Amino acid sequence: MPTSRLTLFWIMLCLLLGVNLWQASVTELIYDEAYYWYFSQQLAWGYFDHPPMMAWMIALGRLLFSGTLGVRIVGVLFSAATYLLVWDMISGVKKNHYVPEFFLWVFSMTLLNAYGFLILPDTPLLFFTALFLWGVQRLLKKNSWSYAFWVGTAMAAMMYSKYHALVVILGVVIGYWPLVRMTKAWVAVLWALLLYTPHLYWLYTHDFVSIGYHLSERPNQPYRFDTFTLGYFINVFAQFGFTLPWVVYAWYKTPKGRFNTVLKSLVFFVLTFFFISSFTKRIQTQWIVVIAIPTAVLVWELYLRDTKIRRKLLVSAAITTLVLVYARFGLVHESLLPIRYETHGNLAWTSRLKASVGDSPVVFLDSYRNAPMYAFYQGGSSYSLNTMGYRKNQYSIDGSYEQIRGKKVALVAPKNHVFWQTNAPEFSFEKAVDDTYHGLWIDRFTYYDQIKASLVQVDSDQAIVELVHPYSYPINAQHIFLSLGVIDDYKRVQQQIPWSLSGQRLPVVWKAQDTLRLVLNKPELLSREISGIRLGVGSFDLPAGLQGDPQKRTTWNP
């Protein structure tokens, strides 16, 4: 690359880096970012929802800066490195003459743009996908051991970022079958598995909680064409905006070659995989973001060779970029957008809540999103109490309850939460316009979310329930109650039925690590035809939680 062109490339890359650093520092966190920040407070080899890469990145960033920039800075640097890797994978000799045009093109890709300043699982996934493909390109050119280990390291890093990385790896291998016959490719896989062993061990010691949640426990909903399959195609458009026609054209018209075959196969595999998946679940926009990396290369390879599409592509990219620039300003200034987004008002509502509760710990009913957001902006302890109608999350497994056990806490929930049907609020605050939260005080917070409840035997009118006490200290079993949740085919709780423990001799001192075996009558109001059940245990006046796993049953009878 001529010196002047090289200088221009680095100037534009640094300008983009500077813009993203500014945006990262002035844009309030979105809820998922706050949740991942919470991960970073307790570094581990894994977390309930995701592998640990984001937590590591955020922890590193917090050593460098405070505030939102500290949370996001490593992701911003990864984004800049991603653009550099994409540029280096483009083989056209004329690319040095189109540096500004290249940056216009990559900046116009919606989520590649957004992950330039947001820290989400796809931020490292995009970077390590680019690193992986960069290594594959060189392994195909020069079948060397160094590139084999490079590819293996990148594969492991992808899997440490997000489980969807497996789709990328399979897409490359299945799409370009000759890789299977390469000894060094197998060495790369073995090296990746070795590097990934700590996370696999973490999954093993935590009963594969992440895999179980994503594959079986996660609630779903009935199929709807508009939100499932049609929504999938809308998400594809959202990836590329007005450049989509030229993206599709490039997928078909890019010149042949081993590496281009790899890239095309990856795009086709990812799109096909999630298209088929759209008939069983809603496809989130970011799930297909990995196609941005191979697409960025393929489109620019064609741009350098096909003069007919250049103007059309750049005009489309410019229109999309203008929309994205306006949206990015709108993330900072709420008045610019017609809707309220997650980056608006978080410091304000957490400050209002802080004014009501002072330095007391805050327990949020059913919100792993609000709890870390409050802790990030206001400090102190917060916790998500997950009831039967909600879902498990990191607060379910990390022992954070012990930090506030027995303390005076403020419990808060939206004003329309079912909890307020039987409890009177003691204070309120506005989270946003027309979004009021109520709260009350609990002098000695006690909740047993780690009890394991299971239905081990069912007769026509009775059942045997086992409750396993996992804590290292005794508890008073007379303070607990049992609820039976009736779930539908999509694991959503449709009805909660109190399950009377009358006649049971519950101990005042329930010894640590002990198991209670209860013989209970069939709950009243339970119909015979059901899709499944879930047990929950509550304590005092606090609602039943997620102590039991979903169990498929068609009737109450055995």
Which ranges hold each PLM region?
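Membrane-interface transmembrane helices that cradle and orient dolichyl/undecaprenyl
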Residues: 92-96, 132-147
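Short helix- or helix-capping micro-motifs
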Residues: 102-110, 155
